[in-house]
Swiss-Prot record:
GO BP: any one term: negative regulation of DNA-templated transcription
Name of this protein: Heat-inducible transcription repressor HrcA
SUPFAM superfamilies: GAF domain-like, Winged helix' DNA-binding domain
Pfam families for this protein: HrcA (PF01628)
Top-level taxon of the source organism: Bacteria
Gene coding for it: hrcA
Entry's family note: Belongs to the HrcA family.
Biological role: Negative regulator of class I heat shock genes (grpE-dnaK-dnaJ and groELS operons). Prevents heat-shock induction of these operons.
Assigned keywords, A-Z: Repressor, Stress response, Transcription, Transcription regulation
Molecular function, one GO term: DNA binding
Length: 341
């Protein structure tokens, strides 16, 4: 849309705003009455005719009004100059709620719950990817002479606890050596390399530690390998049914896409530029199941590192300014919370 068509864009913007609010096709008289466009209904009708001819709006079969198309929503999003700012109270409430999380899992669970409530859409968060996580620390705790607790803490704040049943008892001196060996093998290593390092420990250890090292290594390898990338947290899936009519009979396929996770993970995994919010509208998701759906997403992380992607999924009839602001704010505060851990 050329810059000379600013008035027509104002008409388009008004149509998008009203349709998102009312769910009803919008007519020229309603636009003039609600938005004070400074022109007559006839002029607005002419502008709407041009917008329709250019594919920005369309006429539903049963109405004399018009609704935005994917192209119309894209133009609206591309020309957003301001997103709705959150109030100081809202920002403080977000931070306080996320800070209440006891570990990474809890923080992310709180984030999806909060984002779903704020946007009344489906919130999605990708767990930190295998390639981006390292072992910050391994703690080895003796529960009994023949039983150990292993606590793996990653730099992304994830904590895993596993029990190791030993075949025989070990004394404090052996426990100390075991702790040193495991720590040296794991501390600071990427998870993708840590499982290999710990698997090789048994061959390098003293005879009296070979069996306990083997047992501990088996448990650790299982733990480390479970930190895969295909983990997605969802919140607010019930919001889809509230907006079922907006999906034009495609709700089942959207639910299937969420269950399969592949499409959503692909969109989230593409988020690598910190602070940037991306909007995919309808066919831009490159997935047949997601027609009629928009995804607003951004990366989250801490200390300059991107841990994963997060965002909101809903119908194309979405409050884009508000959703963009909420997604950006929650991602920013997740980063603050994780950076301070």
């Amino acid at each position: 849309m050329a810059s000379a068509d600013d008035r027509r864009f104002e008409v388009l913007r008004a149509i998008v705003a009203d349709y998102v609010t009312t769910k009803e096709p919008i007519g020229s008289k309603a636009l003039v009455d609600r938005h004070g466009l400074g022109v007559s209904s006839a002029t607005v009708r002419n502008d709407m005719a041009v917008l329709e001819a250019e594919g920005y709006i369309a006429q539903p079969h049963t109405s004399s009004g018009r609704v935005p198309t994917e192209k119309g929503y894209r133009e609206f999003v591309n020309r957003l100059e301001d997103v709705k700012p959150l109030s100081g109270a809202e920002r403080k409430a977000i931070l306080n709620f996320l800070e209440g999380g006891v570990d990474l899992d809890d923080v992310l669970r709180r984030a999806v719950r909060l984002l779903a409530q704020m946007t009344r859409q489906v919130a999605v968060v990708q767990y930190p990817t295998l390639s981006s996580s390292s072992v910050r620390h391994l703690e080895v705790v003796s529960l009994s002479p023949a039983r150990l607790l292993l606590v793996v803490i990653t730099d992304t704040g994830r904590v895993d606890q596993r029990i190791v049943e030993l075949g025989d008892v070990i004394n404090d001196e052996q426990l100390g050596r075991l702790r040193v060996l495991l720590g040296a093998a794991l501390d600071g290593k990427k998870l993708s390399a840590a499982s290999v390092a710990v698997a090789e420990l048994a061959e390098q250890s003293d005879d009296d530690l070979r069996d306990p090292i083997t047992r501990a290594a088996t448990v650790l390898v299982e733990t480390l390998v479970e930190h895969h990338e295909e983990r997605l947290l969802l919140g607010g899936t019930a919001n889809l049914t509230r907006n079922a009519a907006d999906f034009g009979g495609q709700l089942r396929t959207v639910l299937e896409a969420l269950e399969e996770q592949v499409v959503v993970l692909r969109l989230l995994a593409a988020q690598q530029e910190a602070g940037r919010v991306t909007v995919h509208i309808g066919h831009e998701t490159a997935a047949e199941q997601m027609i009629g759906t928009s995804v607003v997403s951004t990366p989250y992380g801490a200390g300059g590192a991107v841990f994963g992607g997060m965002g909101v999924l809903g119908p194309t009839r979405m409050d884009y300014p508000g959703t963009i602001a909420n997604v950006a704010a929650v991602a920013m505060y997740i980063g603050e919370v994780l950076a301070n851990r």
